UniProtKB/Swiss-Prot annotation:
This is Extracellular metalloproteinase 1. The lineage of its organism: Eukaryota, Fungi, Dikarya, Ascomycota, Pezizomycotina. The gene is MEP1. GO terms for cellular component: extracellular region. Zn(2+) binds at H430, H434. Keywords: Glycoprotein, Hydrolase, Metal-binding, Metalloprotease, Protease, Secreted, Signal, Virulence, Zinc, Zymogen.
């Protein structure tokens, strides 16, 4: 076991590539002339969610035959969607709150309908707690397309996607290798970080019809795309999913949002052996002396490339990751050792805290070695400090469980000297939380469940929520306001529309604000504002633990801050694929019902209702209905 001395500065930052704080009005393919606006290809909201309260009004699950949580879930799908063809997705697990999470994928003629899912949440009592459903119910294709093979070949699909989205991928001289009956890999291409693939699948369209498509996967760095090209017409792209959502350690310790909030400290062995039993500097096979271990691998990436294994990373004698840094140092490369160390530290603390709250191996977390605890390994987070592929941003790519996540932290040029995103914890926590939400929502095997506009907005909001919750100080009250990204952006207003506040005069956002918003960061600000209200309601009821880790009593955090973080995380795993605000709210209420028997029902309802997501709120992508009503028992 490594004995380390850490110099720390508190960081509270948080593949699906998700970009961080940059205020913008559209989501485009990053950094290239002629980039296409991906909002035109977003997946539509199709999911329904049957909450615990609604389940009580339906025929009892007791009529189902007794069995395991998998058998109960399967029986529910059979009875709810009779005569439907589906398969069990191999990422089911029982979370640390005792809920069995089971997911099914609809199929047609043995071919997946890629956006048709059914998730079932089975409670500790063996009965269904809730479920989500986006199964396709329209007419089935008359014949199996594999019989006549009346569809374009995959190379045509790749070229069609390349042209339609203006991708920097070249396929001249490339050839196709079969991976399975419905999936191929393209060998000999250039312009992508890994070999593109194509999988034949159906897509349920917004108009209620079904399209046979090639799902073409291309990782081009700042975008990691799943593009659904029509299998009959090589110029028609139906939808696009982007996986990217743009020793001793001398660091800013956990809880410090940026260099303005405190000084750097030297920390010795800062890991938690309950959540990182191999420490941060080993993977069970190798003990490392650089910023590399089971949870993450951090390095300098000035050219923005993908060859991270051979990039520079600090490797000090005696494991003393102690390097000079001050915000006045310039150019940034002069303090790269401190930058990589800080990024490595903050991301590992994220891993450990989220593990305690339920994001473990079974739930699809990021680790090389899962030590036989479930899930798929070989997927630490690749952490690129001072990444040269961009500026004034950060992003995180979340592929399914078993493939490494990738975070890129950029230099911000809004100040002189420039500022390094590695030193703003809120940015790093926000990005890491994209990995959390994309693995939990839809299950570890499906990173495509936060791509509808409101769903993607919640992905941004969760990142801000965890970054803000970690940042709370001992003397903070519900009157305390916080901005997001103020330091890196060199702006007291930060990078969001409003500060996070419980004061309607400071932050007036409500649910119907979304009717005028069409960008995920803006919608995420509305969602985080609601969660901030819930957070303070729970803190006012249960108090606030200002320590770096939660204290549990019978599996429940004993304070309001960590309880809010736990309930929000549990809600991510309960909700359906591509949820809307109403469904995500109900999932948090169901998480509380499971964890505390609904002891916090009214605090949660009042927080949401204050911001227009009360009992009567209704989702319509073009005309949402707000409500300030709470259940009668909460009045």
């Amino acid at each position: 076991m490594h004995g380390l001395l850490l110099a720390a500065g508190l960081l509270s930052l948080p593949l699906h590539v998700l970009a961080h704080p940059q205020p913008s009005t559209s989501t485009s393919l990053a950094g290239r002339a002629g980039a296409v606006d991906l909002n035109e290809f977003r997946v539509a909201h199709r999911s329904s969610y049957t909450s615990h309260d609604e389940m009580k009004k339906l025929p009892s699950i007791a009529s189902f035959r007794q069995g395991t949580y998998l058998e109960v879930a399967t029986e529910l799908v059979k009875q709810t969607m009779p005569n439907m063809e589906f398969r069990l997705v191999d990422d089911h697990y029982v979370g640390d709150s005792g809920i069995g999470h089971v997911r099914f994928r609809q199929t047609m003629h043995g071919i997946d309908i890629d956006n048709s899912d059914f998730n079932v949440n089975v409670g500790k009592n063996g009965k269904v707690l809730s479920h989500g459903n986006s199964f396709y119910t329209g007419p089935a294709p008359a014949s199996n397309p594999m019989v006549k093979r009346d569809f374009i070949d995959p190379m045509q699909a790749l070229n069609g996607v390349r042209k339609a989205l203006n991708l920097p991928v070249k396929a001249d001289g490339a050839h196709v290798e079969n991976m399975s009956e419905h999936k191929v890999m393209f060998k000999g291409t250039s312009g992508a970080l890994s070999d593109p693939t194509a999988k034949l699948c159906y897509m349920a369209k917004e108009d209620g019809s079904l399209a046979l498509t090639w799902r073409v996967e291309t990782d081009i760095g700042d975008n990691w795309l799943l593009s659904y090209m029509d299998a009959k017409e090589s110029s028609k792209v139906h939808n696009v999913v982007d996986y990217v959502a743009h020793a001793t350690f001398q660091v800013y310790k956990w809880g410090l949002a940026d260099p303005t909030e405190g000084k750097r400290d030297i920390l010795t062995n800062p890991w938690n052996l309950k959540t990182s039993p191999l420490t941060w500097l080993a993977d069970g096979k190798t003990n490392f002396t650089a910023t590399r271990g089971n949870n993450a691998i951090a390095q300098y990436n000035p050219d923005g490339g993908n060859d991270y294994e051979n990039n520079y990373r600090p490797s000090p004698k005696n494991l003393k990751f102690e390097y000079p840094y001050s915000p006045d140092m310039n150019p940034p490369k002069t303090y790269i050792d401190a930058s990589v160390t800080q990024l490595f530290y903050t991301s590992n603390v994220c891993h450990d805290l989220y593990y305690m709250l339920g994001f473990n191996e079974k739930a699809g977390n990021f680790q090389v070695n899962n030590r036989g605890q479930g899930g798929k390994g070989n997927d630490y987070v690749i952490l690129n400090a001072q990444d040269g592929s961009g500026t004034n941003n950060a992003n995180f790519a979340t592929p399914p469980d078993g493939q490494p996540g990738r975070m890129r932290a950029y230099i911000w040029t809004r100040a002189n000297p420039p500022r390094d995103a590695s030193f703003e914890a809120g940015t790093i926590i926000h990005e890491y939380t994209h990995g959390l939400s994309n693995r939990l929502c839809g299950g570890p095997a499906n990173s495509r469940c936060l791509n509808a506009l409101e769903s993607g907005g919640m992905g941004e909001g969760w990142g801000d929520f965890y970054a803000t919750a970690v940042r709370l100080k001992p003397n903070d009250t519900r009157k305390t306001n916080y901005v997001k990204g103020g330091w890196v952006n060199n702006s007291p207003k930060g990078v969001r529309m409003y500060p996070y506040s419980t004061d309607m005069n400071v932050n007036p956002l409500v649910y119907t604000s979304n009717n005028k918003l069409n960008e995920v960061h803006a919608i995420g600000t509305v969602w985080c504002t609601m969660l901030y209200e819930v957070l303070w309601n729970l803190i006012d009821k249960h108090g606030k633990n200002d320590g770096p880790v939660p204290v549990f009593e019978n599996g429940v955090p004993n304070d309001g801050k960590y309880l809010a973080m736990k309930l929000v995380m549990d809600g991510m795993a309960i909700q359906p694929c591509n949820p809307n605000f109403v469904q995500a709210r109900d999932a948090i209420l169901d998480a509380d019902m499971n964890l505390t028997k609904g002891a916090n029902k009214c605090e949660i309802w009042k927080g949401f209702a204050k911001r227009g997501l009360g009992v009567g709120a209704k989702f319509d992508p073009k005309n949402r209905t707000g409500s300030n009503q709470v259940p009668n028992e909460c009045k």
